[in-house]
Amino acid sequence: MCGIWALFGSDDCLSVQCLSAMKIAHRGPDAFRFENVNGYTNCCFGFHRLAVVDPLFGMQPIRVKKYPYLWLCYNGEIYNHKALQQRFEFEYQTNVDGEIILHLYDKGGIEQTICMLDGVFAFILLDTANKKVFLGRDTYGVRPLFKAMTEDGFLAVCSEAKGLVSLKHSTTPFLKVEPFLPGHYEVLDLKPNGKVASVEMVKYHHCRDEPLHALYDSVEKLFPGFELETVKSNLRILFDNAVRKRLMTDRRIVCLLSGGLDSSLVASSLLKQLKEAQVQYPLQTFAIGMEDSPDLLAARKVANYIGSEHHEVLFNSEEGIQALDEVIFSLETYDITTVRASVGMYLISKYIRKNTDSVVIFSGEGSDELTQGYIYFHKAPSPEKAEEESERLLKELYLFDVLRADRTTAAHGLELRVPFLDHRFSSYYLSLPPEMRVPKNGIEKHLLRETFEDSNLLPKEILWRPKEAFSDGITSVKNSWFKILQDYVEHQVDDAMMATAAQKFPFNTPKTKEGYFYRQIFEHHYPGRADWLTHYWMPKWINATDPSARTLTHYKSAAKA
């Protein structure tokens, strides 16, 4: 995890513009660099480094002697870089995984390059010989990327929007900043004056398609067919591989553990993989919650079962409320459920940064969207409709859960790794017949639970524990986090303010006082940028007025049972 930033065709003083790049310094606390592009005085790169691999030669932009005309700034991890290096006999100058991008591009061009990358990434690649600029982002947008571009060809790119909003340009006083779409790459022409012109935007991968890099994967051969035992075996193989490949780091690895199915599977598998790799340190797991939190109790059971070195982080309602301003600033969104869920993750990341030397964190993000884990999937009218909704959620991860996971950890200089969003694992899961993936017997993620039932990775009570949203599980059922927040904002937003909400906020008008309160904070930090959130996250197929699972009939029934 790092912070990348670049300008092309700036007509303002670069030393002034570069101040904007310092707004993402939290993403790379170990080192930073600004570098002008040779022959283009109005083009430059900025890089904030979190040293995870190759501490000696890992600074960026990456340039190697063999390709003096190529400049690369990237944020991410390319897990198959060694396999590709060996397959094509590339001669590396560094041990940095991103160097593979330069070699692949020289060999086969940008499309083949990006399709061959197994990992999470956002990059800016400059080819001064052919006068081209390329931007690219991974399939699910696990690594963030934003851009601003004017009609006269000024281009600015950054890992977070906050690094672009204060940039100046003579023809456009208010730069439109927007997220770069996941699963896409863009080709731009570089003009002699340093400005650019977009040539094409290409969608290179659909989440259901097996990625091209699967041809060079180290995964053992999968069994054909959709018999249940065959599918379960294949899923176990792919999940183990997804965790194993993410061990790539020179820094200590830890794991977030809520006690829910997803993070518990990741933690247990991770501990197994670390032992097999003969890693010498014990796995640390971290859980957060208020007193009487069901997550703390469940996480404690998992930690005892797998034998991790477990840490519990307690917080109270006042600490959570006080963090809201920092959280919304870090998130760059005002989505209600995202803000709620981010507070706990922000606070536990802060604790890890302050109290440990670890920077690489594993987590269970992406599973709910992939495996139909949200409780409202019980109301899906058909398996086909559930499949459509699952794919929609995956496509929008970069606006919600992936955004939350990245910003709350990156705010404290940490790097998150998410095995459930592995290309091979997710594409295989989505290739299964729709009826195999729906909730069964009143239990969501039934297939995933069945898959690991005989693996001894988890206690049965955890494997079959009902879904609990992270923002709900950190507090007790009697005093839910969403209720604490709503009670607080009741005294911050009055009825008169709500009556004029549509006039004050005509786009994505908040319908609740909680939503109004978050929007106020967002507008304070990012005035006029409400379009970064296209819509609020809400459950489907039910008449929900609040995104919390604890407001749903299914949850209430389960809680009473």
UniProtKB/Swiss-Prot annotation:
- Asparagine synthetase domain location is 213-536
Please provide one cellular component term from the Gene Ontology annotations of this protein: cytosol
- Give the catalytic activity: L-aspartate + L-glutamine + ATP + H2O = L-asparagine + L-glutamate + AMP + diphosphate + H(+)
Q: Where does L-glutamine bind?
A: R49, L50, A51, V52, V53, N75, G76, E77, D97
Q: Which residues carry this modification: Phosphothreonine?
A: T545
The residues that hold ATP are L256, I288, S363, G364
Q: Which pathway is it part of?
A: Amino-acid biosynthesis; L-asparagine biosynthesis; L-asparagine from L-aspartate (L-Gln route): step 1/1
InterPro entries per UniProt: Asn_synth_AEB (IPR006426), Asn_synthase (IPR001962), Asn_Synthetase (IPR050795), AsnB_N (IPR033738), GATase_2_dom (IPR017932), Ntn_hydrolases_N (IPR029055), Rossmann-like_a/b/a_fold (IPR014729)
A molecular function GO annotation: asparagine synthase (glutamine-hydrolyzing) activity
Residues annotated with Phosphoserine modification: S557
Enumerate the PANTHER family for this protein.
ASPARAGINE SYNTHETASE (PTHR11772), ASPARAGINE SYNTHETASE [GLUTAMINE-HYDROLYZING] (PTHR11772:SF23)
Miscellaneous field: The temperature-sensitive mutation affecting G1 progression results from a single amino acid substitution.
What is this protein's name? Asparagine synthetase [glutamine-hydrolyzing]
